[in-house]
Amino acid sequence: MKINATLTPQKLQKKTARVFELAGEKIRAIDAAWDPARGTPVFTWKGKYTSRGWTEWTQGFQFGLAFLHFDATGEETMLKLGREKTRKYMASHVSHVGVHDHGFNNVSTYGNLRRLILEGKIAREQGELDYTELALKVSGAVQAARYVPTAYRAPWSPVAATPAGTGVAPSGYIYSFNGPQSLFADTIRSMRSLVVAHQLGHVLMGEGDQPINLLHRAVEHAATTARFNVFFGAGRDSYDVRGRVAHESVFNRNDGQFRCPSSQQGYSPFTTWTRGAAWIICGFAEQLEYLDTVKGEDLDAVGGRRAVTDLFLETAQAACDYYIEGYSSKDGVPYWDSMALNSHQLGDITKRNADPFNAHEPVDSSAAAIAAQGFLRLGTYLTAKGETTAGKRYFQAGLTIAQTLFDEPYLSADPRHQGLLLHSVYHRPNGWDHIPAGRKVPCGEACMWGDYHAVELALLIQRLAAGQYYTFF
């Protein structure tokens, strides 16, 4: 990536305003056209949203978009839409025991509504605040209950200089919808559900009325994700490149031993599915921000503040560095996988801008939108800690990506197209994405998580331009 060092949030304000304008049109169009009996809109097919996939994991993005739009513009109809749809459709997601997506669905809806109340953006009604907080407490506990232990109890750290016997034990994880053998990179963003519930004073009650600490479980999951889904250039396997991310880790459930990396949606276990890496970048960066609110003694049982912080920071930086240096195009947008079957046909992608209309492999703008927010948050975090050089590098990388996404050919101004952020990919190996006539790879379509994270990114930049900030907690 060629990072633009001169960009500022203020310089992107015209672009973010355009994002909010177009997002409003798309939100209203989808609400008017979508029949909830069809399930949840997931991605577009020939410009129209359709449902597809395993679970209703994108419904929180659909309604969360309305809250984000209200936050950015003050448009009361969007607040009304978000409130009404959340009350009507989201309760089943709060108690859903079969998914790893509580952060996506519930933090995007109940979490955004609570944040707006606490920020004073809307009138504080205690009943509404209590309702959102109860939903978030239950969501965090239900998500935490989807847990299995590993065989690993010894402390571990990706930081080479860590003294022996210190670190965080990768001793368990929240398993994916593939089953208890499966740990997804994506799930790091659902750790928001656990830590928000913890912040609200909640615990998961287990057998014999034993309380289970939700913060500790979130840290445990994060450590296991870092240990097995992220690579640190330490010779773990023949393809161990620092910052590489495997979408999935597979464990033997009889003994808890790690067996192999895998990939549900990427090209292979030994390349990087770029959206999976984006979840790591964003997820670990925002958890670092949350750690600053936690008392040191509350982390002692999982290795201590220094060990947890070092693990989170090295994981985030490794994934960010590989994004910038390893597989991003010059303009900050990655292809869907770092080295898919036909990637060699593209030449050196790091030396030129991404081409969503190429004939070999699709780009994934949604990966860029997710990662950009992580870059901004990590950059802000490091700068506040006095690490200004690294902080500025990541922060400017985030702005560089945003500048690219918030313009053609990625931002959709076509009123006939229901999507906002074009050229995203859902599941390339399964062939789920639309390939236009005369082309060889998917392009020109949007997805609900891409649209949501584009608006979330624009809102963060809008706040930064005004000298403000926001977090999920």
State where each predicted segment sits:
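Glycan-recognition and catalytic cores of secretory/periplasmic carbohydrate-active enzymes
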Residues: 1-473
